[in-house]
Amino acid sequence: MAEIKVLALDLDGTLTNSQKEVTPRTRAALDAAIAKGVTIVLASGRPTAGVLPLAKELGLDKKGGCILSYNGGKIIDCRTGETLYQKQLEAQYVPELCAFAAAQNVTIITYNKEGVVTEHPDDKWALRECFTCKLPMTGVDDLAKYVDYPICKMLITLDPARRDEVWAAGKKQFDGRIDLYPSSPFFIEAVPLGVAKDGSLAALLEHMGLGRENLMACGDGLNDRSMIAYAGVGVAMQNAEEPVKAVADYVTAADNDHDGVAEAVEKFILK
């Protein structure tokens, strides 16, 4: 097996436990991996600002590392803040996505420099995004008119019972123009066509002069499936959705509440 030089980690349901914390064992495993020269990439659907606090908590702003945000829409260098990769959602799709969400009677959000923006600031799933990312909420009257600046993604929030139904309708309406896929039972991501974690990681590896055989990726959600299939070592958490486990090279015995990431890092990097 080729030496692992890059470790891509999904956050929610993978790196963090149910309390959105990184446990001491997992933190120690990551510190040991960094000491061996491994570059940590925090790979999330969250906006960049929603990943920065965790990156700082792990010391990546000083030790080095990257943030892959918006499900692959942007990658930054944690130490310098430099943008290494970015793809933005074409402005023409913002009003159509807002209209689609209204027709489906679900909430849609996006982000500004400060935090989360939506027409439905009391929506419990939108508030969950604020809590998870530690970002403030801004309520607006007309989201389509408000968004007059470049964005990397929009996010549909909805009751889990409706996720697959709304996802199917969205894929049909936007087929071949933008990509929609679930990142949790209550979130559907709307991103530029072709944006996914695997593609942006491929660009990062090329930038670093490395290949996919040097990448290990850990995740649990459907939006992690592409990077797990792409990586030289693809790891699905015990709590991962079944289609994710199906493409993984390894499924952890432990879930995200019991140091599943530490288990994988110890097995494949610190062995």
Q: Where are these predicted regions, by residue range?
A:
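Conserved acidic, metal-coordinating active-site core of Asp-based
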Residues: 100, 104-218, 222-224
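Short, hinge-like loop/turn segments at secondary-structure boundaries
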Residues: 57-61, 85-86, 125-129, 197-198, ...
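Active-site phosphate-binding/coordination module
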Residues: 24-125
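Mg2+-dependent phosphoryl-transfer enzymes with acidic/Ser/Thr/Gly-rich catalytic loops
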Residues: 2-6, 23, 189-271
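Short active-site oxyanion
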Residues: 37-41, 63-65, 153, 213-214, ...
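Asp-based phosphoryl-transfer active-site loop
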Residues: 3-19
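Short, structured coil segments at secondary-structure junctions
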Residues: 58, 63, 71, 174-176, ...
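Hydrophobic packing residues within well-ordered alpha-helices of enzyme cores
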Residues: 26, 51-55, 166, 170, ...
